[in-house]
Design a protein with these regions (language model features):
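Surface-exposed amphipathic alpha-helices with a cationic face
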Residues: 47-55, 105, 125-129
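Short acidic capping loops at alpha-helix termini that bridge into adjacent secondary structure
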Residues: 19-20, 81-84, 112-116
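Conserved Lys-Pro-Asp/Glu-containing loop-to-beta segment of HAD-superfamily phosphomonoesterases
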Residues: 95-125
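A short, structured active-site edge motif that brings together acidic residues
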Residues: 80-95
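Glycine-rich phosphate-binding loop signature in dinucleotide/nucleotide-binding domains
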Residues: 55-58, 108-114, 171
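N-terminal helical cap/lid subdomain that shapes the substrate entry/recognition surface
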Residues: 1-48, 54-56, 67-72
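Acidic, Mg2+-coordinating phosphoryl-transfer loop and its flanking beta/alpha structural elements
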Residues: 116-156
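Short secondary-structure boundary segments
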Residues: 65, 89, 121, 139-142, ...
Length: 171
């Protein structure tokens, strides 16, 4: 969930302000762009969840802090058809700012009161809550926040994708 910054920090103990970080980050991102789909797979239960959402006539989208150059090839690789995609470089701000969620809702003419936003990082929940969207913390994924998921102030915590289908909105 912390992207290249988090991976480089964990692997090499290097931070963005350190000498050599920019070069290392560029090399990493170039490599990632070439190989990101090599071992990529959707989390267990996600394909079925998306099929069920679509079968119900609902729409779903992707709102990520990952840049478009990485997002769109993965969407194509996994043969996904989201109604909307908002990447980290789509707007001038990214999560935890709520604006990417508001932008996505506006793009598909949807209301916050009728939406659910699920995420595996506290930034996701902060963005959803800021956009007044029902927030769901998922217990699968990267869970990059140092805070326990129970402390994220989510409207709901789920343990597997199938639980998302039964959500009744309360916001």
């Amino acid at each position: 969930s912390s992207g290249a910054r988090g991976l480089l920090g964990a692997a090499f103990g290097i931070r963005p302000e350190d000498a050599g970080y920019a070069e290392m980050a560029k090399e990493f991102l170039d490599y990632y762009e070439e190989h990101m789909a090599d071992h990529s797979r959707l989390f267990d239960g996600v394909p079925e969840m998306l099929q069920d959402i679509e079968a119900q006539g609902a729409r779903w989208g992707i709102i990520t802090n990952k840049h478009a150059r990485f997002v769109h090839p993965l969407i194509k690789f996994h043969m996904l058809e989201p109604a909307v995609v908002v990447c980290g470089d789509t707007l001038k701000v990214s999560k935890p700012n709520p604006e990417p969620i508001r932008f996505a809702l506006k793009s598909i003419n949807a209301k916050a009161s009728e939406a659910i936003y699920a995420g595996d990082d506290k930034r996701d929940i902060d963005a959803a809550n800021g956009a007044d969207v029902f927030s769901v913390a998922v217990q699968w994924g990267y869970l990059g926040s140092p805070q326990p998921v129970q402390d994220w102030c989510a409207d709901l915590i789920v343990h597997n994708p199938s639980e998302i289908l039964g959500i009744e909105l309360t916001k």
